[in-house]
Amino acid sequence: RRILIAASEDIGNSNPNALLLAGECFRSVQAVGMPECRIILGQCAVYLATSAKSNSTYLAINKAMELADKTSNLPVPLHLRNAPTKLMKEQGYGVDYLYPHHYPEHFVLQDYMPPELKDTKLYESARNKREVEGERLQQRRWQQQQQ
């Protein structure tokens, strides 16, 4: 259990393969049992210990949960609401929604937060290679959409 949590909480997106390896470790330990599973546990523990570290997603989910607790009274923006009935459509549910998969790179500039939370940033990437690359990709997409 602790290896799974360490892979996600302490390593996170700096090395997403760590979570895959930890999950396979968990399954393998159950399949093999003691005493041989100590080898599997050791391999996984060393991999995690020597992997790049990042807790940025851990911090982001905590920040998001705290924000949700404080702002749960705010309504979901109308354009994000499903409109399964005629009345909901008439009330503007789903109007002006932009389906990201209809746009280049499956990305579109669109507000997903209530207006009161506009410009709220929940995720701050760590300064590791993988997260910096992801941040650059997002910045490039935003810039392309703003042109």
Task: Outline where the language-model segments fall.
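Terminal-proximal interaction/regulatory segments of ATP-powered molecular machines
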Residues: 1-107, 111-147
